[in-house]
Amino acid sequence: TEKQSKLNDVMNEKTYTWPKNKPTLQAGVAAIESTSGKILAIGSARNRKGERVLSYATDINKQIGSTAKPLFDYGPGVEYINWSTYTIIKDEKYSYTGGGVMSNYDFRYKGDLTLRESLRDSRNVPALKAFQQVDNSKIYEFVTSLGIVPETSEGSTYLHEAHSIGAFNGSNPLTMAGAYQAFSNGGYYYEPYSINKIILRETQEEFNYSSNKQKVMSDSTAYMITDILKMVASDTGVRSAVGTPIALKTGTTNYDKETLNSLGYPSSATPDGWIVGYTPNIVMAMWTGYDTNTKGEYMLNSQMTSHRNALYRALAKAVFDKTGKDFKRP
């Protein structure tokens, strides 16, 4: 399809200039139709040559960073305890229940913030507080209904608090596109699929395939989260690049201290960058980063942020339709 070939051009360095001297920097992308779950385009790797081995769109498990916040924190807060975009959450010095200080990306605290401000500026402390306010089993129900597989002990549904900032065994772009789809379409989940129909060779019988539609959140929850994430799309320059209403969430992750020390990386080195964005018609999730660690090759947080946003802008131009259609207010 046209979308697939334009996406390939970005991934194969024809229409996007990848950062210099970063040969092992990778990416994976998945785009689906938001009203059906049908897969529209897949980017399995940068410069994929020869046999398809590992697909970074479907076969990885990477920590999802702040793209977790609408799923584990604010979505459940709005859905189950009737929060509004104006609910106040205090951004202050704060610790996990089990100890361990939660810090923000800028190592500062901003005091009283609305839910809108907390999510737009991706503050970690308000995210953890939001996660703690909602019944843990309800959060589990919410994210699993969206296709996310959280990190739990055998036979338990208890979610540890680091899920609030996406620090768990992780996900992949196709699963993340599926999860955000419910925010784009008024609260429905369709499992992503790629086969439209099956024809039996003997009898020529045709079976059309479609994904089951499941209502997973109220239309008002979907709209409130979307309304906030539209601001992030403007903040990252994606809205103006695409020229149509779009909502998105960004995420980055950190290396743990041992890895930093063993590889000799600076503390601001970042292994993963994420963006999950959507219009009323299409959802596209992208991971970019390092699948393997090579001594001497890394991205600083600032480099990752700028590459991540620029790569997503290029992919967004390739994949999103310029319909001008906005999200429906319930």
Predicted regions span which residues?
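A penicillin-recognizing enzyme superfamily signal
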Residues: T1-W18, V29-A31, A41-I42, K49-I60, ...
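Short, small/polar residue-rich loop motifs at catalytic or cofactor-binding pockets
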Residues: P23-Q26
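Structural recognition of the beta-strand scaffold that forms the well-ordered cores
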Residues: G28-I32, I39-G43, I88, E117, ...
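Active-site SXXK
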Residues: G37, Q63-I89, S118, G178-F183, ...
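Gly/Ser-rich catalytic serine loop of serine hydrolases
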Residues: D59-K69, A167-G170
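Conserved catalytic neighborhood of penicillin-recognizing serine enzymes
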Residues: N82-I139, H160, Y189, R201-M231
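Short coil/loop linkers at secondary-structure junctions
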Residues: W83-S84, V149-E151, D326
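Mid-domain, small-residue-enriched loop/turn segments at the edges of structured enzyme/sensor domains
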Residues: G100-N104, D135-G178
